[in-house]
Amino acid sequence: MIQMQSHLRVADNSGARRVMCIKVLGGAGRRYASVGDIIVVSIKEAIPTGRVKKGDVRKAVVVRVAKDINRADGSTIRFDSNAAVLINNNGEPIGTRVFGPVPRELRAKNQVKIANMAPEVL
């Protein structure tokens, strides 16, 4: 569960390393975001040669959450940390690679391009 002021790692090669959620998109008063949801983030830490700079405000898709994700078959999955992938205003990833595993719930939330770039889909 990601909410405002939550810090996330960045799981792509866009140049950002850490981001902070400043808004959860998808309805007035929506408080939490989970895997596949789009959030607005502020970049808190970035590498000097990246496509984004510290202080930029961008959109991102949540790809990993530390909170349990319940599946229809009764199983659950959880990750060690919260992570996101930066996207542009058209919904396309800024980076060209995604690091680490992503859950298959991304495909159900129309984030197929990110799921295809990931090395492993759980």
Curated annotation (Swiss-Prot):
Gene Ontology terms: cellular component: cytosolic large ribosomal subunit
GO molecular function: large ribosomal subunit rRNA binding; structural constituent of ribosome
Function of the molecule: Binds to 23S rRNA. Forms part of two intersubunit bridges in the 70S ribosome.
Similarity remark: Belongs to the universal ribosomal protein uL14 family.
One BP annotation, GO: translation
Native organism: Hyphomonas neptunium (strain ATCC 15444)
InterPro entries: Ribosomal_uL14, Ribosomal_uL14_bac-type, Ribosomal_uL14_CS, Ribosomal_uL14_sf
Entry keyword Transmembrane: no
Disulfide bridge map: none
Name of the protein in its database record: Large ribosomal subunit protein uL14
Keywords noted in UniProt: Ribonucleoprotein, Ribosomal protein, RNA-binding, rRNA-binding
Domain of life: Bacteria
Subunit structure: Part of the 50S ribosomal subunit. Forms a cluster with proteins L3 and L19. In the 70S ribosome, L14 and L19 interact and together make contacts with the 16S rRNA in bridges B5 and B8.
Higher taxonomy: Bacteria, Pseudomonadati, Pseudomonadota, Alphaproteobacteria, Hyphomonadales
